[in-house]
């Protein structure tokens, strides 16, 4: 019991609030579900999420994956999970899908990749944000940042109403950088401001991986993720291991990413190709 497990989840309650969902390879147990969405559709969505993460990383080494609401509440999707109940700019399926994906991807990564959370957090945070961005691009390319609010007369002509959901990442990061509030990604976790630790640092790390993918190619970055995951799954690893893997697959100079982008606050105008 507990062999090769990186986390022990204790749930003490008089009632079992967890539901079990069977995917093709892993049983998912969670108390984070939407009663409006039927169980079959929920299972289909969870299966799609799991296959998506496995496509980028590799197979999950355990038979069960526990996703609890308490952990998700500490790592919400800012701008989505904090909206009042009476404001519903996004469809129920979209909101639950992304909420579960963020919770699942964090559990998946934390349960398999053992990196120093004080120094190498940028890689796990960046990988999770990278997965979120790619998932939305693949399955929800039409969703706007403001959801259905963007269609309201009087608002739809404003530039912000035309932004896609994924545009929030560069928008928030660049705004923070212009205010000189961002911190470098090699800043120790205990020295980060709450805003950088919870939001900006994660966005900056994920965007950095997207910029890197544009620079060296999606094929190379995907192969690097998979090799890093395969070599280090359930073992202690360092972000330098990822650097060595990526560097071995390209002759391009990567110092702009591993030195300037990660270790400084240099203001460079990066763009992501559509």
Please annotate each region the language model reported.
Residues 119, 125-207, 232:
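Acidic/His/Gly-enriched intrinsically disordered linker/tail segments
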Residues 1-11:
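Extended, low-hydrophobicity, Ser/Thr/Pro/Gly-biased non-transmembrane segments
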Residues 36, 61, 194-274:
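Amphipathic alpha-helical substructures
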Residues 5, 25-27, 269-273:
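Ser/Thr- (and often Asn-) enriched beta-sheet segments in non-cytosolic proteins
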Residues 61-68, 118-119, 142-147, 223-224, ...:
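Surface-exposed patches in mature extracellular/periplasmic domains of secreted proteins
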